[in-house]
């Protein structure tokens, strides 16, 4: 009996592995595009797991701090896990979250999101790539990838991206190459997560906490 259960699980995993989840998710998104875009709906796509930190969540936290009436639809790395244990998560991703994304006025990314290349976005929807790594310390994306199929998907995804934020004018060319994008799409205004360093912090409290923990 245990062997049959194991074989059944492996069969499900094989079927999941053969699915093109990029195209499936995009297909669901395109179906839900029939509905009207909501100006107060924003989608955050955390394809790279940051544990709820970084530029994506700086935007969310700041909007909530200001009391702005936005509804946030969050798609995490875990939602996109293709495995038998996440069948419920995939179902929710392809239905509820795809619907909310399709009706969002703004979509923010922290990594490449290849389903974007297959999506038919509304003219009312703006897509902004925040990228998780500030600066340009290594080659990535179009500067590094050699798989032609992946490069094709990346190029298509970039065509559906309105803006790519960079931390400095000095890396505009690097970002344009990495995202296979025209330089005009790269906006060098800094990254939201840098705002943390411009806030007032209680340094004395941190020193006391550090001192207490050091002497325990």
For every predicted segment, state its role:
Residues 57, 84-153:
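Extended catalytic core of nucleotide-activated donor transferases of GT-like folds
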């Amino acid at each position: 009996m245990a062997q049959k259960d194991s074989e059944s699980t492996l069969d499900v995993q094989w079927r999941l592995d053969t699915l093109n989840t990029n195209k499936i998710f995009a297909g669901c998104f395109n179906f839900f595009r029939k509905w009207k875009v909501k100006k107060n709906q924003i989608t955050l796509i955390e394809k790279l797991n940051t544990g709820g930190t970084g530029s994506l969540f700086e935007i969310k936290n700041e909007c909530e701090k200001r009391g702005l009436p936005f509804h946030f639809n969050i798609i995490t790395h875990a939602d996109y896990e293709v495995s038998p244990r996440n069948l419920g998560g995939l179902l929710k991703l392809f239905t509820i979250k795809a619907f909310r994304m399709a009706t969002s006025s703004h979509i923010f990314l922290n990594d490449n999101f290849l389903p974007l290349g297959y999506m038919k976005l509304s003219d009312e929807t703006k897509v902004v790539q925040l990228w998780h790594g500030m600066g340009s310390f290594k080659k990535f994306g179009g500067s590094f990838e050699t798989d032609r199929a992946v490069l094709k998907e990346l190029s298509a995804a970039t065509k559906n991206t309105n803006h790519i934020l960079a931390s400095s004018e000095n890396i505009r060319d690097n970002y344009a190459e990495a995202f296979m994008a025209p330089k005009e799409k790269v906006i060098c205004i800094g990254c939201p997560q840098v705002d943390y360093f411009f806030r007032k912090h209680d340094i004395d409290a941190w020193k006391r906490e550090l001192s207490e923990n050091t002497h325990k």
